[in-house]
Every structure is written in structure tokens, then in C-alpha cells.
């Protein structure tokens, strides 16, 4: 069972804190939970792994669409570190979690030991956002985990060589079986928050990436990603030639993090920040 604390505004935040040593704060994707990092965990060296469910996701409390923002989630992450008495942490951010990590570099640079980004960068491709908008906040049409697992390869284009057991695990982690069918594991109001941020011209996020100056940075990119282009990854590497980076074959958005290429980058990143 996860532990909990209350954010400054009173919202219940669920988290998991296990191990000793280097603190690694793991921040999940937009609609996902701390379970995002279950596949990676057995491959990590001894360290202190800290995970959280953002407000409105998983076991955390719901606080309304207006509060489901990257800034609020960054503030909640800092509140969690304060609650745990952690002065500095390395951050591993998947998708939305990487955006939070870059924002933390800008607003709380002294709290970070480094940032490892999983398939996200300063330019978010419209194609990926459009795909996400098709499903965010909606319960799947599939009625069972097994049925959803069978459909996942069709919906997750760009993935190959993924065993059926992995798709079933994904279905079980990110939906709940009920008598009425499968239910999403987050507040449906997240859709309103996402669509509100989807409107208008995209924000310039390069200043957030540049705010990582002085911190070790690593990048894991799904070779077939529709959210992070190769051109953006190349520009990130041009700005940070010391960035540890890889493309993960047979993966789109997002790599599972237990691929050999992902594990290699994460281990190298941890060696640098340790």
C-alpha cells in the first residue's frame, strides 16, 4: 500500500519511498501512476526510489481540472521531498514527468542532482498530443483487461516485439476492472485540463531545458516516438553535448524503461549523479 501526505492545499498525495542511498524521484506520465516504474525497479542499483501519484491520479485525491497543471504537480513534488526530508534528488521523468523535471530545474535548481528524460523534450509534437487527446479522460471500450491487452498493439503503433504478457500488465496497471467494464485510474476531469493546455500556440519550453545547465542530463527516446522527434533530440544534444542519450528500437511513446538501451542510459546517469 502506498503512503500518503497532504499537499499544502490539503490534497492527499500518495507516494512510495523504498531503499536507501541516492534519492531518485520518479515522475510518471500524464495519465499514469507510480506503477510506471515497476518494470525498471528490478534493474536499478541500490538507491532510494521515491515515486508518487500526481493529484487526480491513482491513489491520490482529486482536486479539479484547474489544479492539474505541470506547475502544481512540480510544487507537489517539492512538497513530497520536503515531507521526506530530502534536500536533493535525481529525477527520472517519463513524458509529463520530464516536463515537471525541467520545470523543477528552472524553479528549484538547487533541489536537483540531475534529470533523466524518458521520451520528452522541449518540443512536443502535435501528432502525439492529438493521439493522447483521443483517449485522455475516457474509459476504454474494452470490457476486460484481457480484451484491452489484445487491442493494445493496434493502438500503440510504433511498438514491436512486445510480448502479450506486457500488454496485459499495462492493461492491469492503468485500468480497474468493475462490473460496468474497465475504468481509468485517474480523474476524468484531467481531460479538461489537457484540452485547455492543448489550445493556442505551443509554449517555448527551451528555456526550461536550458535551465538544466550545470546538472547531468540524460535522454531516452523511443525510436518511433510521435511525441519527441529526432530533430528535437538532436538539438537537445547540440545544446548539451554531454547529455547521455539513446534511441530505443521497437519503441514509440513511451519506452517501458526495462529495455537494455534504457537501462544502460539510466545506469550511466546514476553513475554521474552519485
Regions found by a protein language model. Give the residues of each.
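Conserved HGGG/HGGXW glycine-rich cap/lid loop of the alpha/beta-hydrolase fold
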Residues: 11-62
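Catalytic histidine-centered segment of alpha/beta-hydrolase-like enzymes
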Residues: 248-260
Amino acid at each position: 500500500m502506498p503512503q500518503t501526505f497532504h499537499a499544502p492545499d490539503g490534497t492527499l498525495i500518495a507516494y512510495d519511498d523504498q531503499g536507501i542511498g541516492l534519492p531518485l524521484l520518479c515522475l510518471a506520465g500524464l495519465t499514469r501512476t507510480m506503477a510506471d516504474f515497476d518494470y525498471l525497479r528490478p534493474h536499478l542499483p541500490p538507491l532510494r526510489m521515491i515515486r508518487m501519484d500526481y493529484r487526480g491520479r491513482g491513489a491520490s485525491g482529486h482536486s479539479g481540472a484547474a489544479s492539474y497543471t505541470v506547475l502544481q504537480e512540480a510544487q507537489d513534488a517539492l512538497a513530497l521531498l520536503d515531507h521526506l526530508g530530502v534536500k536533493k534528488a535525481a529525477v527520472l521523468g517519463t513524458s509529463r514527468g520530464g516536463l515537471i523535471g525541467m520545470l523543477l530545474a528552472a524553479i528549484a535548481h538547487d533541489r536537483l542532482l540531475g534529470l533523466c528524460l524518458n521520451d520528452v523534450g522541449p518540443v512536443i509534437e502535435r501528432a502525439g498530443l492529438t493521439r493522447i487527446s483521443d483517449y485522455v479522460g475516457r474509459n476504454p471500450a474494452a470490457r476486460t483487461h484481457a480484451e484491452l491487452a489484445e487491442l493494445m498493439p493496434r493502438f500503440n503503433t510504433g511498438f514491436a516485439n512486445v510480448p502479450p504478457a506486457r500488454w496485459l500488465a499495462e492493461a492491469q496497471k492503468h485500468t480497474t476492472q468493475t462490473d460496468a467494464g474497465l475504468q481509468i485510474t485517474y480523474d476524468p476531469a484531467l481531460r479538461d485540463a489537457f484540452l485547455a493546455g492543448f489550445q493556442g500556440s505551443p509554449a517555448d519550453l527551451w528555456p526550461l531545458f536550458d535551465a538544466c545547465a550545470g546538472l547531468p542530463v540524460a535522454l531516452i527516446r523511443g525510436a518511433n516516438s510521435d511525441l519527441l522527434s529526432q530533430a528535437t533530440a538532436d538539438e537537445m544534444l547540440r545544446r548539451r553535448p554531454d547529455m547521455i542519450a539513446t534511441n530505443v528500437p521497437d519503441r514509440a511513446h513511451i519506452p517501458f524503461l526495462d529495455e537494455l538501451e534504457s537501462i544502460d542510459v539510466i545506469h550511466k546517469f546514476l553513475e554521474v549523479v552519485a
